[in-house]
Swiss-Prot record:
Protein name stated in the entry: Adenylosuccinate synthetase
Binding site for GTP: 13-19, 41-43, 306, 332-334, 415-417
Annotated source species: Hahella chejuensis (strain KCTC 2396)
Enzyme class: ligase
Binding site for substrate: 300-306
EC code: 6.3.4.4
Keywords: Cytoplasm, GTP-binding, Ligase, Magnesium, Metal-binding, Nucleotide-binding, Purine biosynthesis
Protein's UniProt keywords contain Metal-binding: yes
Oligomeric form and interacting partners: Homodimer.
GO terms under cellular component: cytoplasm
Amino acid sequence: MGKNVVILGTQWGDEGKGKIVDLLTEEVAAVARFQGGHNAGHTLVIDGQKTVLHLIPSGILRSNVACLIGNGVVLAPDALLSEIKTLEDKGVPVRQRLFLSPACPLILPYHKALDLAREERLGSAKIGTTGRGIGPAYEDKVARRGVRLGDLAKPERFAEKLKEIMQYQNFVLEHYYKVAPIDYQKTLDETLKMAEELLPMMADVTDMLHEFRKRDENVLFEGAQGSLLDIDLGTYPYVTSSNTTAGGTATGSGFGPMYLDYVLGITKAYATRVGSGPFPTELFDDVGAYLAKKGNEFGATTGRPRRCGWFDAVALRHAIQINSVSGICLTKLDVLDGLDVVKVCVGYRTADGAEITRPPIDCEAFGEVEPVYEELPGWKESTFGVKRVEDLPKNAQDYIAFLEKQIEAPIDVISTGPDRNETITLRHPFSA
């Protein structure tokens, strides 16, 4: 029997999903993206060679894996073609392996202009977006005025749709944000030119997924960003514009939720966040700087330094619940090597002194809580590259056991380094 496994981040993104997706693609016939856009950044290291992917699923490096981009993904044609060229220059035959849903909304130049103008207008209250037009493209989708990949198959109809929406968006750019409009003819010509390369990769992704299911083949669904950035369930408004939680798998691909067999939550052994928003365990001391330096905490997409903090079991329990997580993959354990003490947030103290064990829904209230910590002894020995749990330092094993108890979920996979073979697998998602 084939299995359908979802991989998603359980924190604020940057949890190390790319490596784990690449590791698990040994078992699959297909990998599918179901939300987000080129604001995602997946860094893969294979035999010491670094590859950063933004739109294309991480399985693209495997010759026997179909890579699908579902309807929930917003597609920037220029970014996708640039990524394809980068991979083709490395000898990867992308166009034979990549399939795009015609229902993908397109990100076009006016979306990026709106994104940048909006962040500029917000000033110190900015969300901290990547400035790549993701949010405005999702807005157009929900407002039912967006253009989709399938529209490019009929150039005359596309030209009419584009003209109508650009009249609206250019009015907003000029008269509200007081910035230069985007040229319609240039946008039309460039997009139709790119369509010549994109349309041959267009396919009914939903139907393909169900064909894999009927043939009892394994499929992996690759999430982007993290659960605490979900548009509905994250730290709103400091969130992304898509559903990053398990529910987005079904709506972003057309693959019903009852067909999903296992949800793997990718979780760092500490916590990081890029951009603005609540982060109760954030560290501003030498330990925070240590984690940032040792963990190389800079965004794969933006290059921005990530905020670093201790492991937050309260936020993670919430993520486990809203995703029906089957098991956790703990990443970057080796970054904690050398610390005398490691802390885990086990509760929050509110502004009025009450202790709570769930994150506040209100973002302002979330930003005011203070973490309640449990301290555990650290370890001096290296965990880097360890492949068996019994070979980990005793204190590292105790840390993992403590986390399991706090989050009320099994830790099935432990990553001890960036390469795919630097992994401890306690329970394999495709055989669980």
